[in-house]
Structures are given as structure tokens and as C-alpha cells.
Amino acid sequence: DPYNSLAKDRDMLKGISTHEYDYEATTDMRLFCKQYRVTIWLCTHANTEAIRQVYRDGLYQGYPKTPESSSIEGGGKFVNRCDFFAVCHRFIQHPTEFMNSQLHIKKVKSISSGGRCTPLDDPIMLKAITNNVGYSINNESLVKKLKAINAPF
């Protein structure tokens, strides 16, 4: 479930705003990750205004635009507090593009390992393989690669 589905501590909310609460929560998450050397993948949804934005023309005319980093519920504070931020966008009602998922990498704090943001109009494309048995990534089937290297699974 996304972050906004989690119940907030009502006693803590009596003294601070939800904005401050979210900052406290994300600070606690960062400290937890640092202390235990783990990663948290925090899922959120786009805010209502972002969902109303649609493409005006082209293949996706009339379908929701890809949300920006600051378009998440709760605003840009989540982007400001994280080391890595990605947006997964799907056109689930599109007659031909419903099986595609676009992965937009919006923030990479540490680029020393070779990571970087995706270009604005060139996301990583994941296409569901027939019968939903996996994905091809940028039109390259990972299933075929695994078979070629004789992977044990």
C-alpha cells in the first residue's frame, strides 16, 4: 500500500501539521536506513491535480500525463528527503499501450556508481510478456537472456 494509506499517530499530530509529521517520518526512515544499512522503497500516488493533467495530442492524447516528482501526494518534501526517486507510469486504459509501463528515474543522489536520471522523453520501457510472465525492458527480453546463460531458475 502507498504511504498515504498508512495511519498517522494521532497523538503526534495534535502538536504539528501533517507536513511536519511527514518530515519527521521521513527523517526517522533515513536514520533507520543509515543505522541498519538498508533501503526503504516508499510508494506514493500522484496528487489529484496531477491525475487531471492529460496529453493534448499524439499517441497518448487524452490520457494522464506522467506525474512530476513534486506531483506526489504530500508534495516535493518526499523528493527532497530521498536519495533515489522513480515514477512508474502506465496507460492502463489505452487500446494499444496498456501492457507498457514507463519507468522515469527523476533523482539519483549518488551518480558515482554510474546511475543517472532518464531523459525526459525517453523512460525505461517495460512491456508485459504475454500471459504476464515477466517483462521485456526496452524491447529486450530478459527471459531469453536467462535461458541463453542457462540460469538455474
Question: Predicted segments — roles?
Answer:
Residues 1-30:
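Helical hairpin unit composed of two closely spaced alpha helices linked by a short loop
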Residues 16, 31-36, 49-153:
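C-terminal regions of RecA-like/P-loop NTPase motor modules
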Residues 5, 45-50:
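Signature of the SF2 helicase/ATPase Hel1-core->accessory helical subdomain module
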Residues 38-45:
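Structural recognition of the conserved hydrophobic beta-strand(s) that form the central parallel beta-sheet
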